[in-house]
């Protein structure tokens, strides 16, 4: 019996950590700033566990019955936590209240589990052995969960089904305990019925997981969701309405097929057309292949390397018929080489030189992306360019995120490079900004590809003129150890979204 109860410790430790990871991941997906979200979720969860452990002192008789009930409650609340949070984000204005309330409730219940189980084991081991065995299995369970979560659960099950699976494990522990401790459970039939009810609810939730996600996302997106994928790095959603296809990463719009050509023509051609000798081009980010499509409009280009972290992103835009139609089959071109790796690490490892680089990362909404907008990153990138080479960076909105935009400019300049900022109007985004960086002064091109839909030599100079409400403001450069850009970005966009 004792080994079976210790196995329960392993399982419930795994469950508790998975619920915590799911809450932190969902908060990062939906609210951004992963450091803040994980810090506050973990802090709330640990404090709640402390409350649960303190409350366990008031549990006197009926330890086995109360342990089973706690397991069922953890399984029910934790199992449905992800589904509740998805729906709450879409339909309530108090998502943070729901988030921390759920984290607190689950934390209190998990905090009750181990003290109750230790008291159940004290008649079978010496106290020192109880503590040693329970904590050993508790930590091993946490290790297993921390490995399973990013490698198996998120990419293969998604957040909703992962939570439900571990809810079923909690319920399974409750059923197992009623069999192991049947002599200490006077109301065993009632507990069996409660366990069965919880299992049935969780199974129904599992079967309805896709529908739950549809309900949650139907209010997040104005158009119909035609594809949704969870990867170890992000949630990819495609929506469609008539001939307008839109890509969202972690609920943030990346492009609309109706006007993305404005963004991508402005991103690529002002810089690349000014480099008539460029033959080798590097693309960092841009896993949709749309920047590559624009690069290949220059017949002189001999080689393009695209580095994107998420293999599912590049696979999707290499195989999906509507998406390959949009990027003109860019990834099938023999001149294009795709590398799925962290761009920062890849720059440190490779020694290849490129004549021009396009940096097309998502906005710096969290620190993992913010590191790709730092002096350290731009310095590493510059080492892969010849003396007359250049790069261009998408740099958020100079109108809606003015400090963020000029922070990118300041950061490029702090790397001892010359920065040439410009902007363009994209209906799906509004005013959007870019920065060309290099060691030599930038001069606007005298020719452009002939098949552009938006950009012309006549309109190009206007992109480099900023009206008073978008002109430069005093900001700090974005360094790796401070990442002030993430704070600027969060403050500015939070102010707009209120």
List PLM regions with ranges.
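Alpha-helical transmembrane segments of multi-pass membrane proteins
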Residues: 1-228, 232-323, 328-427, 432-441, ...
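SAM/dcSAM-binding transferase cores
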Residues: 440-498
């Amino acid at each position: 019996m004792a080994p079976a109860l210790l196995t329960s410790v392993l399982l419930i430790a795994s469950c508790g950590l998975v619920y915590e990871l799911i809450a932190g991941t969902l908060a990062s997906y939906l609210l951004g700033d992963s450091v803040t979200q994980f810090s506050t979720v973990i802090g709330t969860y640990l404090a709640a566990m402390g409350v649960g452990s303190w409350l366990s002192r008031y549990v006197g008789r009926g330890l086995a019955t109360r342990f089973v009930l706690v397991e069922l409650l953890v399984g029910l609340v934790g199992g449905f936590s992800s589904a509740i949070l998805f729906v709450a984000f879409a339909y309530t204005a108090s998502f943070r209240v729901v988030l921390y309330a759920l984290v607190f409730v689950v934390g209190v219940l998990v905090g009750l589990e181990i003290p109750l189980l230790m008291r159940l084991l004290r008649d079978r081991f010496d106290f020192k052995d109880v503590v040693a065995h329970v904590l050993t299995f508790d930590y091993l369970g946490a290790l297993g969960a921390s490995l399973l979560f990013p490698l198996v659960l998120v990419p293969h099950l998604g957040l909703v089904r992962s939570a439900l699976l571990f809810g079923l494990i909690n319920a399974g522990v409750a059923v197992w305990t009623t069999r192991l401790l049947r002599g200490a459970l006077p109301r065993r039939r009632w507990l069996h019925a409660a366990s069965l009810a919880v299992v049935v609810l969780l199974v129904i939730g599992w079967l309805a997981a896709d529908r739950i996600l549809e309900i949650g996302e139907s209010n997040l997106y104005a158009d119909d969701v035609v594809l949704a994928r969870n990867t170890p790095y992000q949630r990819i959603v495609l929506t469609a309405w008539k001939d307008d296809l839109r890509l969202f990463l972690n609920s943030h719009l990346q492009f609309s097929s109706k006007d993305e050509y404005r963004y991508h023509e402005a991103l690529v051609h002002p810089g690349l057309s000014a480099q008539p000798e460029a033959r080798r081009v590097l693309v960092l980010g841009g896993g949709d292949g749309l920047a590559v499509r624009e690069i290949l409009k220059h017949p002189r280009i001999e080689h393009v390397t695209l580095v994107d972290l998420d293999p599912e992103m590049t696979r999707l835009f290499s195989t999906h018929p509507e998406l390959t139609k949009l990027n003109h089959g860019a990834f099938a071109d023999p001149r294009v080489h795709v590398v799925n790796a962290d761009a920062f690490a890849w720059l440190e490892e490779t020694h290849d030189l490129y004549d021009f680089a396009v940096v097309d990362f998502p906005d710096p909404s969290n620190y993992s992306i913010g590191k790709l907008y730092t002096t350290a990153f731009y310095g590493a990138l510059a080492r892969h360019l010849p003396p007359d080479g250049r790069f261009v960076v998408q740099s958020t909105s100079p109108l809606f995120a003015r400090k963020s935009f000029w922070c990118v400019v300041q950061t490029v300049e702090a790397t001892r490079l010359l920065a040439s900022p410009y902007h363009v109007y994209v209906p799906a985004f509004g005013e959007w900004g870019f920065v060309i960086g290099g060691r030599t002064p930038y001069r606007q091109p005298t020719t452009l590809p002939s098949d552009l839909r938006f950009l012309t030599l006549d309109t190009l100079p206007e992109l480099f003129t900023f009206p008073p409400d978008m002109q430069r403001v005093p900001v700090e450069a974005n360094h790796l150890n401070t990442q002030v850009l993430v704070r600027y970005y969060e403050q500015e966009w939070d102010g707009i979204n209120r």
